[in-house]
């Protein structure tokens, strides 16, 4: 029999006793009274705060959204199968948050930041970013002055978007809203390749899982997933997950913005978020307002979209920004931006409904897409007459501003005369000239899906259209002319395109563009 060594026994006992703490850990615990439809009423959490994360004994988490006299209303962030009446719930004493780091780029995550793409855990250092956060104050912002190139001719020319802007994309279903936003993400590859990436976040709210998978595949095939994160709350996910998905996307965007980098976020779409929020609010027995939406649905969207901003260039001031997360304070840099492209779906073109008017009033402009244009083959189907960018004009590059200055007015005039021309064929030469030029410009502004144009190519072809250099080219041959024209400039006059990209429109550049257009259009003369 082995001998017991008293010294060894006492050493083990001392080691165990040294780690003993007499302090008791106190958790504030409540009890589930009722549960159903993704909502639990909990008794006993007297000190719970609004928006706090609570944990059920099954491990499921929820967010406190209703504080009543004797109970709290908790929305569940997952299926309620394992939660029963009298289950225990404990406070976590922290606000709902998401862990963000460089490793989240190129991944598909859910509302809580958990990866759902089957590629394993998110690697590298992460920082805790709250889902709900106050927008930067006035002194931490600066005006929008840098362009965010979308690669879409009609947007970059007539409804320009700047870094830090909120530009609404609005239209009926199946008019190409998502395509406009995905093309904008694809166009940022040019900057990623140049070592100046614009980090993109695509938030899919209430969409089919197959649609999200198709978008992820498109981004991957085009090499755009290398700088993009997808946040997905699918149609099958609980309503609270759909409500908070845009906030999770905004938190990821703020990580890049606050570390001094440009980011772009697409909310696809906020109509579905509003519907999910209405569902949650009605289940919490909040009084319904217009169209049965709760009274604070405007605040839901305004507090989300106000988080998009161009942060001041001064690092010292940026470090003092209000509501900075503790985890990020040492990493803060000035000069970052978060640009938002929220999408709203209208019913039969009714832009005066409740949610569309709310979001129009919050954003810095809107891009209207119409079914009529889409069905007539004008794609992207942007109605330039009612689309506007309130702050993007200051961000447009100088060469584009000079070239496209009158384009919007010309096209509006063309649409008016085109409608008038339907009533009679006896038109004066001036009117015929405007209609002829307008038709060719419409062809120039057409663009294929997932085919963004570099800004210098846009300026070159729009210059030819706005100066009426295509008058000898038949309308059906305009796209063919465009291909030849841009290919010729790219091979023979690359320096001209580079000058345009730098924002300069010199006499020499104008001569080259004019001469090239005249030479190429001559072969189309009858």
From Swiss-Prot:
GO terms for molecular function: ADP binding; ATP binding; proton-transporting ATP synthase activity, rotational mechanism. Disulfide bonds: none annotated. Pfam families: ATP-synt_ab, ATP-synt_ab_C, ATP-synt_ab_N. One of its GO terms (cellular component) is proton-transporting ATP synthase complex. Keywords: ATP synthesis, ATP-binding, Cell membrane, CF(1), Hydrogen ion transport, Ion transport, Membrane, Nucleotide-binding, Translocase, Transport. ATP binds at residues 171-178. Belongs to the ATPase alpha/beta chains family. This is ATP synthase subunit alpha. It comes from Christiangramia forsetii (strain DSM 17595 / CGMCC 1.15422 / KT0803) (Gramella forsetii).
């Amino acid at each position: 029999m082995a001998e017991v060594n008293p010294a060894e026994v006492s050493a083990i006992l001392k080691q165990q006793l040294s780690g003993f703490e007499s302090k008791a850990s106190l958790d504030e615990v409540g009890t589930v009274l009722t549960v159903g439809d993704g909502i639990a009423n909990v008794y006993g959490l007297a000190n719970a705060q609004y928006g706090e994360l609570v944990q059920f004994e099954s491990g499921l988490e929820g967010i406190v959204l209703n504080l009543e006299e004797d109970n709290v209303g908790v929305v569940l962030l997952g299926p309620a199968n394992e939660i029963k009446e009298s289950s225990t719930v404990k406070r976590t004493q922290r606000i709902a948050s998401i862990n963000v780091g460089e490793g989240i780029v190129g991944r598909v995550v859910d509302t809580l930041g958990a990866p759902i793409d089957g590629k394993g855990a998110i690697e590298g250092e992460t920082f805790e970013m709250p889902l709900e956060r106050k927008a930067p104050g006035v002194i931490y912002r600066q005006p929008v002055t840098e362009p965010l190139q979308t690669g879409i001719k009609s947007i970059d020319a007539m409804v320009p978007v700047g870094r830090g802007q909120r530009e609404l994309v609005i239209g009926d279903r199946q008019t190409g809203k998502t395509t406009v936003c995905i093309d904008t993400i694809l166009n940022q590859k040019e900057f990623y390749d140049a070592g100046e990436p614009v980090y993109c976040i695509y938030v899919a709210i209430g969409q089919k899982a197959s649609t999200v998978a198709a978008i992820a595949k498109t981004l991957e095939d085009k090499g755009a997933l290398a700088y993009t994160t997808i946040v997905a709350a699918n149609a099958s996910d609980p309503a609270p997950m759909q409500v908070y998905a845009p906030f999770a996307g905004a938190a990821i965007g703020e990580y890049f913005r606050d570390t001094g980098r440009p980011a772009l976020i697409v909310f696809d779409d906020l109509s579905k978020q509003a519907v999910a929020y209405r569902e949650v609010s009605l289940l919490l027995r909040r009084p319904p307002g217009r169209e049965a939406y709760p009274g604070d649905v405007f605040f839901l969207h305004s507090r989300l979209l106000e988080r998009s901003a161009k942060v001041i260039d001064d690092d010292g001031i940026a470090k003092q920004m209000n509501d900075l997360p503790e985890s990020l304070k040492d990493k803060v840099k000035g000069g970052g931006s978060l640009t938002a492209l929220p999408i709203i779906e209208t019913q039969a073109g009714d832009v005066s409904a409740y949610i569309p008017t709310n979001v129009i009033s919050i954003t810095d402009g809107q891009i209207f897409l119409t079914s009529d244009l889409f069905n007539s083959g004008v794609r992207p189907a942007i109605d330039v007459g009612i689309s506007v960018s309130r702050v993007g004009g200051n961000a447009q590059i100088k060469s584009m501003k000079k070239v496209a200055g009158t384009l919007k007015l010309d096209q509006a005039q063309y649409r008016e005369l085109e409608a008038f021309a339907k009533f009679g064929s006896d038109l004066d030469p001036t009117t015929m000239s405007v209609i002829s030029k307008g038709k060719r410009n419409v062809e120039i502004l057409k663009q294929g899906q997932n085919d963004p144009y570099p800004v210098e190519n846009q300026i070159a072809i729009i210059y030819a259209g706005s100066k009426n250099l295509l008058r000898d080219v038949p309308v059906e041959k305009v796209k063919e002319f465009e291909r030849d024209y841009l290919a010729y400039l790219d091979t023979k006059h690359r320096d001209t395109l580079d000058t345009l990209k730098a924002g300069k429109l010199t006499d020499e550049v104008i001569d080259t563009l004019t001469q090239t257009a005249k030479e190429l259009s001559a072969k189309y003369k009858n």
